[in-house]
Amino acid sequence: MSFDNLRYLESEAIHIIREVAATFSNPVVLYSIGKDSSVLLHLAMKAFFPGKPPFPFLHVDTRWKFREMIDFRDRMMREMDLKLIVHVNQDGIDQGISPFRDGSNVHTHMMKTMALRQALDKFSFDAALAGARREEEKSRAKERIFSIRNAQHAWDPKRQRPEMWRTYNTRVSAGETMRVFPLSNWTELDVWEYNQKENIPVVPLYFAAPRPVVQRGAGMIMVDDERMPLEPDETVTQRMIRFRTLGCYPLTGAIESSAETVPEILREIVEARTSERQSRLIDFDEAGAMEKKKREGYF
């Protein structure tokens, strides 16, 4: 990717972030700790330099994230001196919701979708910036940069507004909110090339290292803590792996890889023949799973 293209993508994203700050009364950044969130955080810092972003960062904690993700989150927020809101769906905790016992669909609905809706309502946020990209998944491919949600935080593809020549309709009615995706036009390759250019810190799990995994179905699941139950025929082995995408560890498959640096990751992406979200189990709960989740309020 040329430097000029990265500069255009950066300029577009910063313009969108500033547009949100200028037109909404109480925006927030959804910080999921992944590589896209790291780029979004970096862009938000650039957009308001030498000041700080005029809005908080929200992390919806499912209690099943990789431990390295939580350590990275806390370190970044502390070093940058940013306001972080961590929200957990206490109803889900009280019910003992688990991706192992209840499955990915129930877990995601309770601990991600419902938790996000609770947080947006609790703090009366009227706009939520997030790092989703159109290239990632087909339902995201057809979503606008400024994506209006109704009073129940649901997405209706038929209500999408035209977006032409970087002109955005930011108006919302009472009770409605807006999800905003400044990285909509970025690809996975763009994200990593920008990471290389700007030297953006990311969770170490993106880089290959020997890690404990079990082979489960067609995927490899990393054993991140003692809560993971093993099937009778499963054995934990050390393998050289990394992750292209990060989420709850029981629902995120690893890939075998020797890519320990950003240039090596870039070469691997160019040669890849599968989507980066191919290893995210929540995308395959049912036909049209991601669009259904978005209609229910998922980011």
UniProtKB/Swiss-Prot annotation:
- Function, please? Proposed to provide activated sulfate for transfer to nod factor.
Record flagged with keyword Transferase = yes
Keyword hit for Disulfide bond: no
Q: Which PANTHER family match?
A: SULFATE ADENYLYLTRANSFERASE SUBUNIT 2
The record's family statement is:
Belongs to the PAPS reductase family. CysD subfamily.
Q: What organism, scientifically named, is this protein from?
A: Rhizobium tropici
InterPro entries noted in UniProt: PAPS_reduct_dom, Rossmann-like_a/b/a_fold, SO4_adenylTrfase_ssu, Sulfate_adenylyltrnsfr_sub2
Which NCBIfam families does the record associate with it? CysD (TIGR02039), PRK05253.1 (NF003587), PRK12563.1 (NF009214)
Which biological process, per GO, is one annotated for this protein? Answer: sulfate assimilation
The gene for this chain is nodP
Q: Which reaction does it catalyse?
A: sulfate + ATP + H(+) = adenosine 5'-phosphosulfate + diphosphate
Known EC number(s)?
A: 2.7.7.4
Q: How does it assemble?
A: Sulfate-activating enzymes, NodP and NodQ, may be physically associated.
Q: Keywords of this protein's UniProt record, alphabetized?
A: ATP-binding, Nodulation, Nucleotide-binding, Nucleotidyltransferase, Transferase
Checking SUPFAM superfamilies in the record gives: Adenine nucleotide alpha hydrolases-like
Which Gene Ontology molecular-function terms are recorded?
Answer: ATP binding; sulfate adenylyltransferase (ATP) activity
Organismal lineage: Bacteria, Pseudomonadati, Pseudomonadota, Alphaproteobacteria, Hyphomicrobiales
Q: What is this protein called?
A: Sulfate adenylyltransferase subunit 2
Superkingdom of the source species: Bacteria
